[in-house]
Amino acid sequence: MGFSALVASALCTFLLPLLLFLAAVRLWDLYCASGRDPSCPLPLPPGTMGLPFFGETLQMVLQRRKFLQMKRRKYGFIYKTHLFGRPTVRVMGAENVRHILLGEHRLVSVQWPASVRTILGSGCLSNLHNGQHKHRKKVIMQAFSRDALQHYVPVIQEEVSACLAQWLGAGPCLLVYPEVKRLMFRIAMRILLGFQPRQASPDGEQQLVEAFEEMIRNLFSLPIDVPFSGLYRGLRARNIIHAKIEENIRAKMARKEPEGGYKDALQLLMEHTQGNGEQLNMQELKESATELLFGGHETTASAATSLIAFLGLHHDVLQKVRKELQLKGLLSGPNQEKQLNMEFLEQLKYTGCVIKETLRLSPPVPGGFRIALKTLELNGYQIPKGWNVIYSICDTHDVADLFTDKDEFNPDRFMSPSPEDSSRFSFIPFGGGLRSCVGKEFAKVLLKIFTVELARSCDWQLLNGPPTMKTGPIVYPVDNLPAKFIGFSGQI
């Protein structure tokens, strides 16, 4: 074979497929750009749409924060992309986010990716709209009133204290993140769904925790339900969770009065169904309960793990927490216990600022999803009707001019008379607007109790130093945060 024939063969083998691939990508970009609203004079935001059909989903899933930071550096505070099968505009910055969050029902409406809607189900709060969402949220909010939270305080304190005692006997290395997840799961099962202590065996509890991990790993995936796909695995894990929750619902139906002296969120939903004409069937109750468990333990586990990491790296901050506890009479000796209540917790201003600073630097949920109800004009660009909109929590915190020395862990920034979260949309760990997190007050109380018990019973060392954090979809440490825990003497 002559040289020219070899060159021609090589061109056909390598160059032609490459040209076809580049042409397909270009045609895909043009196809996506054809979704632009011609009646609006503004251009689409800058950005790329990735591969045909797949868009940039695979890049985002594999690289997460690195991918998002690269996009922000290249395109700024608003850019277009293609994620989870939909053309999408990602926005950040207080003003841009304010426009989205205050436009609920008028400019935008909630719409999670198809895989999330399929796995969590149409009956959960985050997938409801308008009046239906308003009424359901009002019912669930009863489970997070101040009186309800007061009932939860001793339950949370009991679980946290027992867990920390086990950590102190765990030896030279304990993987913090899996242990915190199990703790938060037990608390959520008791408080939100009304499971009683020891209702589930350790093996049964571990099976549920693993099922939740599998479901959440595959929550954001391509909407393809075939064996071994992410959506298939997520649905299979969800069905395990639903089976256990159905047992609990049927047990509740057989009882006349709630156990534990308070009504959990699931009990309130069931009573609302029976008394107000909103007929939730068993599937909808299971979906609502699954959503409560997801919101009630995954996000708090992420935040509590970040708290341990930041306090382990900043011993001066931990000492300030202990000094505040000492001033309030909450720093006891190793053999004494001080029962907490809402009044005590509300007095712990610095501890609250430590939690705020943790949520600023490491918000558990990176953002929220909306869909444009009509073509929007935002920051000199158009967002066409029907396109998805993602508002970024983590990026908004990162770029907020309000925060000085943004990368520094400094809880004192929130202690001043004009705290650095005074701008409403610069600090949004719980989202905002009509769709803000329904359980945010529960999360704050839980994290405060966890911080108090941790500070007055434990000292610890992070064995791998500062952790590398990853989003998947909740923020977590890649190495599971190995640490060594020892008892705190009670002396500052």
Curated annotation (Swiss-Prot):
One of its GO terms (molecular function) is monooxygenase activity. Its cofactor is heme. The gene is CYP26A1. It holds the Pfam family p450. The keyword Membrane applies. It comes from Gallus gallus. InterPro entries: Cyt_P450, Cyt_P450_CS, Cyt_P450_E_grp-IV, Cyt_P450_sf. It is a peripheral membrane protein. This is Cytochrome P450 26A1. Belongs to the cytochrome P450 family. CDD domains: CYP26A1 (cd20638). GO terms for cellular component: endoplasmic reticulum membrane. Heme binds at residue 437. Its EC number is 1.14.13.-. Induction: By retinoic acid. Keywords: Endoplasmic reticulum, Heme, Iron, Lipid metabolism, Membrane, Metal-binding, Microsome, Monooxygenase, Oxidoreductase. PROSITE patterns: CYTOCHROME_P450. It is found in: Endoplasmic reticulum membrane; Microsome membrane. A cytochrome P450 monooxygenase involved in the metabolism of retinoates (RAs), the active metabolites of vitamin A, and critical signaling molecules in animals. RAs exist as at least four different isomers: all-trans-RA (atRA), 9-cis-RA, 13-cis-RA, and 9,13-dicis-RA, where atRA is considered to be the biologically active isomer, although 9-cis-RA and 13-cis-RA also have activity. PANTHER family: CYTOCHROME P450 26, CYTOCHROME P450 26A1. Transmembrane segments: none annotated. The lineage of its organism: Eukaryota, Metazoa, Chordata, Craniata, Vertebrata. Disulfide bonds: none annotated.
